[in-house]
Amino acid sequence: SALPRKALLEDKLFDGVRASIYHTSESRLLLELSTQERTHTMVIDRDWQEVQSDVLMDDPSDFFFINRLVMIVYGVAIAPHHMLKIHASVTELEGNALLFLGTSGTGKSTHSRLWRKFVPGATLLNDDEPILRIMEDGEVRVFGCPWSGSTPCYRNASAHVTALVH
């Protein structure tokens, strides 16, 4: 991007994708996602009211970039609404949810799959990026979302959080 970078806030490499977040001299945030083949950027104004990206959807790989960029913006935009996107696999049973937390590869999805296999009525609510929300009455609920993990699961549903298991 042509925007001057003022300060690097975060730089992570995961699954061959580098994500770098910078402050710009115009007090905006610049998010840069890079693979070996391509780099795309997104610029967010200081109030999170306007987001611009250079993704043109003119290459098959652009879906990956736009999906990641939207996921990141969504995760920040929901915070003022008492919501948090987390990394977990969620098993639902009779309206109650168990959230299995941990880093990638620790068995969250496997644990959820075993619940579905051995506990009658257990279902998968989300397998990677569920949304936690503190409701006005103080109840904590978990919601499915458009992002899932190793098991495709895109449910527009929610359940009462009974336990967080790490």
For the regions a protein language model found, what residue spans apply to each?
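Conserved lysine of the Walker
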Residues: 108
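Hydrophobic positions on the alpha1 helix immediately C-terminal to the Walker A/P-loop
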Residues: 111
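A noncatalytic interaction/capping subdomain that flanks phosphate/NTP-handling catalytic cores
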Residues: 1-104, 114-123, 131-166
